[in-house]
Amino acid sequence: MIRFAIIGTNWITDRFLESAADIEDFQLTAVYSRSAERAGEFAAKHNAAHAFSDLQEMAASDCFDAVYIASPNALHKEQAVLFMNHGKHVLCEKPFASNTKETEEMISAAKANGVVLMEAMKTTFLPNFKELKKHLHKIGTVRRFTASYCQYSSRYDAFRSGTVLNAFQPELSNGSLMDIGVYCIYPAVVLFGAPKDVKANGYALSSGVDGEGTVILSYDGFEAVLMHSKISTSYAPAEIQGEDGTIVIDTIHRPERVEIRYRDGRLENIAIPDPKPAMFYEAEEFVTLIKENKLESEENTFERSLTTAKIMEEARKQMGIVYPADQA
């Protein structure tokens, strides 16, 4: 049995725990919130025996083996390193950290302490993303990849009214690129590797974070054009265009409908049924790594997390988006 703690008492931790409930060797034993009352309420809700409002005290506790970090982006590195230095395995929400330097520090801490560290990028473990990879060769030489994750934020109305909530605060290393653009970039890295060049532009909000943008990754013979937005919504599918056909994906962050449209007019549906919650597979992978004494995922590798961090840092640089964490 792997005993888990969680940092964060929000909708994403609720969803993670609901997904992990189907994993036989998963047990939630500890909850952290800055509010002792909130920690206690969340622990009671999910039958966790321990509630903490002090991170140092929690890290030193022996009541859990691993921690799932779902705090604001700017806090990921500090919290992850703290827990790894106390011998705890860490599953950290995407994006791993604010920038490349912090990502490197997290990876170094994992290696130094001999613990598992994995970025919680759920997409790469989903059955239909794996099917996409399996059938990619059928479209011949790839000539273009397009993907978008554009979703009007539920917090943007407040921003427009003059209230800047966490989702749009540079102090927390937030913004469209970091929060949802990563769902386009990470799959591109998994499918095609590190790009030769990165070009980016976008719209900066008055708070100092990006509201939307486009990232173009250059590869040998093709480009990946990736669009992200928290101030508008897109319904366009993702496409991997090859010389012999095109793979059409309904949504890149959670593929459910995936088909190949061949140049000769044939249509092949390659999607498979997926009854599990989306976050189940990343939790299952993480638990398996711990049980098998493996320190790094073969799918969400350190190299892929670091490449993604480098791309996003370069994209932010070109957009003129600077976080306080960049100046630390």
From Swiss-Prot:
What induces this one?
Is not induced in the presence of scyllo-inositol or myo-inositol.
What keywords are annotated for this sequence in UniProt? NADP, Oxidoreductase
Q: Which domain of life is it from?
A: Bacteria
Q: What class of enzyme is it?
A: oxidoreductase
A single GO molecular-function term is:
nucleotide binding
EC identifiers of the protein: 1.1.1.371
Gene3D superfamilies for the chain: Dihydrodipicolinate Reductase, domain 2, NAD(P)-binding Rossmann-like Domain
Q: Keyword Transmembrane helix on this protein?
A: no
Q: Which reaction does it catalyse?
A: scyllo-inositol + NADP(+) = scyllo-inosose + NADPH + H(+)
Q: Which InterPro entries match?
A: Gfo/Idh/MocA-like_OxRdtase_N, GFO_IDH_MocA-like_dom, NAD(P)-bd_dom_sf
Its biological function? Catalyzes the NADPH-dependent reduction of scyllo-inosose (SIS) to scyllo-inositol (SI) in vitro, but is unable to dehydrogenate scyllo-inositol and myo-inositol. Is less efficient than the functional paralog IolW. Under physiological conditions, may primarily function as an NADPH-dependent oxidoreductase that reduces carbonyl group(s) in its substrates. Cannot use NADH instead of NADPH.
Give the protein family: Belongs to the Gfo/Idh/MocA family.
What is the protein name given in its UniProt record?
Answer: scyllo-inositol 2-dehydrogenase (NADP(+)) IolU
